[in-house]
């Protein structure tokens, strides 16, 4: 939901920040995040997210999207749920 958008934006910001990555112990550069590819299917409500199945639902939707788009082999998933 929109309440979790801050988790995603913070993750992207940290992956693009060389200083943060150095503090985290890596010199790997993720480069600029392609924002136009962010959340192409809408929010968890839009894709019929079942309560209590966050990880499984997000993972299965990501695999399905990679298959349907046919353009990529990798995806980044960010979840902030216990």
Language-model-detected regions and their locations in the chain:
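Claisen-condensing/thiolase-fold acyl-transfer catalytic domains that form or cleave C-C bonds
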Residues: 1-82
